């Protein structure tokens, strides 16, 4: 009974210090705000401002569940306990224990290694005995497999059906994020560490995007989506970014509705800055050729923007053809639309465009007179 009384006291103290909800992976998309080139100032706000950095801390009931459940932290057997203590007493190095447990045999094998809990226990006990020379669970994994490799392992582990593997991966994930923040890595820097700069338009398809997003969410005082927008638009341009969003919306199970929210924020930024439909047409590079204009996914973004722009107060409403005919002449458009009508998939949209072009052509002289 005394143990439970002490335990309850500990739980109460922890619960009074932190008021948060459990979030195992910490990777969830939320709404966006304005884009900025701000530096990740939150890196300097370590433990004293944990709540501002979005750190998830279990509630009191969850802590009790965690501390009492043998599934959360696998206990050492008698022999494992003796072995760990022997390594610590004899001052065996991380390298020695890492190799001894076979954790240097490849990422896949390391993740499924049944002795992961033994290595974690060794690290914890080593740090207790050497408080001025502490080491991290992450150290040898990063040294052996690189941060990118560890991130891949973490993403696999967090989704594992094995609770021990999931918890070990979560701890590695936390240490990896803290390492980057302690090293003052930028969003661009971690983007390259994870080799996300090599995946092109498939940015929302790779699970490593989640790790990058989680780092930004914890490492920056600004909303994470703002930073994501800035980095991706700087790298891919708005035309490329719009296409990436289109692809990402088909991977809801991996990134949720983040691509939709980012695209919405991008459009709202333009509206807030009163960017004309003509300018957005160019930003999306829709002025660079008629050949694939009808099938260009960026046209959907532009049309949506134009309609929202026309609803704004104190702006002169425009039409789709008013903008398009500033970049392509009537003859070119007519020819393209006639050819498009021959393609079954494009027939309806081509006919709609053709009708709008005729209406615009008939109204153009009147509009010039009024102007």
From Swiss-Prot:
It comes from the Eukaryota. It is found in: Secreted; Host nucleus; Host cytoplasm. The keyword Magnesium does not apply. Keywords: Host cytoplasm, Host nucleus, Secreted, Signal, Virulence. A motif (RxLR-dEER) lies at residues 43-53. One of its GO terms (cellular component) is host cell cytoplasm. Induction: Expression is induced during host plant infection. Residues 1-24 form the signal peptide. Effector that enhances P.infestans colonization of Nicotiana benthamiana leaves. Belongs to the RxLR effector family. The RxLR-dEER motif acts to carry the protein into the host cell cytoplasm through binding to cell surface phosphatidylinositol-3-phosphate. This is RxLR effector protein PITG_12731. It comes from Phytophthora infestans (strain T30-4).
């Amino acid at each position: 009974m005394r143990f439970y009384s002490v335990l309850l006291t500990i739980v109460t103290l922890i619960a009074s210090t932190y008021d948060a909800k459990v979030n195992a992976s910490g990777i969830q998309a939320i709404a966006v705000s304005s884009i900025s080139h701000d530096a990740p100032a939150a890196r300097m706000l370590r433990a004293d401002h944990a709540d501002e950095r979005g750190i998830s801390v279990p509630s009191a009931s969850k802590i009790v569940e965690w501390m009492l459940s043998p599934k959360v932290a696998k206990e050492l057997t008698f022999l494992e306990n003796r072995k760990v203590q022997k390594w610590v007493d004899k001052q065996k190095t991380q390298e020695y224990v890492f190799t001894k447990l076979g954790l240097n045999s490849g990422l896949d094998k390391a993740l499924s290694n049944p002795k992961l809990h033994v290595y974690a226990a060794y690290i914890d006990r080593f740090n207790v005995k050497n408080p001025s020379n502490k080491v991290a669970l992450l150290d040898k994994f990063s040294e052996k497999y690189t941060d990118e490799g560890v991130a891949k392992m973490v993403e696999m582990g967090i989704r594992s059906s094995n609770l021990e593997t999931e918890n070990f991966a979560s701890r590695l994930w936390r240490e990896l994020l803290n390492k980057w923040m302690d090293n003052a890595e930028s969003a661009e820097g971690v983007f390259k560490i994870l080799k996300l700069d090599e995946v092109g338009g498939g940015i929302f398809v790779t699970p490593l995007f989640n790790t990058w997003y989680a780092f930004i969410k914890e490492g920056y005082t600004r909303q994470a989506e703002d930073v994501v927008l800035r980095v991706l638009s700087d790298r891919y341009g708005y035309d490329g970014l719009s296409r990436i969003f289109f692809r990402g919306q088909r991977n809801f199970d991996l990134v949720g509705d983040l691509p939709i929210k980012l695209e919405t924020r991008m459009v709202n930024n333009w509206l807030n800055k009163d960017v004309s439909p003509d300018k957005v047409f160019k930003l999306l590079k829709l002025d660079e050729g008629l050949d694939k204009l009808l099938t260009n996914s960026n046209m959907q973004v532009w049309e949506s923007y134009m309609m929202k722009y026309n609803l704004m107060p104190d702006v002169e409403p425009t039409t789709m053809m008013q903008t398009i005919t500033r970049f392509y002449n009537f003859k070119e458009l007519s020819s393209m639309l006639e050819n498009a009508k021959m393609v079954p998939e494009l027939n309806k949209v081509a006919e709609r465009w053709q009708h709008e072009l005729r209406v615009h052509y008939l109204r153009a002289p009147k509009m010039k007179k009024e102007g």
